[in-house]
Amino acid sequence: MTSLNSSASPTSSSSDQSDATTTTSTHLSEEEAPPRNNNTRKRRRDSSSASSSSSMQHPVYRGVRMRSWGKWVSEIRQPRKKTRIWLGTFVTADMAARAHDVAALTIKGSSAVLNFPELASLFPRPASSSPHDIQTAAAEAAAMVVEEKLLEKDEAPEAPPSSESSYVAAESEDEERLEKIVELPNIEEGSYDESVTSRADLAYSEPFDCWVYPPVMDFYEEISEFNFVELWSFNH
């Protein structure tokens, strides 16, 4: 009996030790291992923040995507098909957007939604609606040198003329019209009296001699000039 008890005791002690080691190892493994759910959540948050920051830093254009290495690609879906026309890889987003506008005008016409509608009349037109011709015209549009004034045309419209400027313009027009009218005589102070006196001089301009009486002659001298016939000089 004693031999059996002695042999059983070491086995029980060894089993207890093994149980203790397993429990401690499990506790250590649980403490050392980080939770998986927290890591996945952090990664999702980082990716969402990165995508939001990238969208805020770069402009968003229709039909344009940004590659991970910094280039911009443009493509457009063919009408009534599942395939897309690859327009190319470009350095800037504006170049890719202009390429997309050319393809959209060719495929959809006037109903196309453009990234730069103010440049529609300046874009090159492809020779046909084939994918190759569309790609060629898109590359030409992307290489265009566009002035900033054309892009800011719609953003900053011209200010309407002020009331003061319109009044000055109307006044200048009236002055030009008055210059075309025949110039009237200038009537100043005293000119009316001068005209009256001049008219009086013209109306009553008679020679001065008419107003001078002839010299008084002697009565007898005046009679002697005439030969009087004697009325009672008849001979009987």
Curated annotation (Swiss-Prot):
It is found in: Nucleus. Induction: By UV LIGHT. The keyword Transcription applies. The keyword Phosphoprotein does not apply. InterPro entries: AP2/ERF_dom (IPR001471), AP2/ERF_dom_sf (IPR036955), AP2/ERF_TF_ERF_subfamily (IPR051032), DNA-bd_dom_sf (IPR016177). Residues 60-117 bind DNA. Pfam families: AP2. Residues 1-27, 161-170 have a biased composition (Low complexity). One of its GO terms (molecular function) is DNA-binding transcription factor activity. GO terms for cellular component: nucleus. Signal peptide: none annotated. Residues 1-60, 152-174 are annotated as: Disordered. One of its GO terms (biological process) is ethylene-activated signaling pathway. SMART domains: AP2. Keywords: Activator, DNA-binding, Ethylene signaling pathway, Nucleus, Transcription, Transcription regulation. Probably acts as a transcriptional activator. Binds to the GCC-box pathogenesis-related promoter element. May be involved in the regulation of gene expression by stress factors and by components of stress signal transduction pathways. Belongs to the AP2/ERF transcription factor family. ERF subfamily. This is Ethylene-responsive transcription factor ERF036.
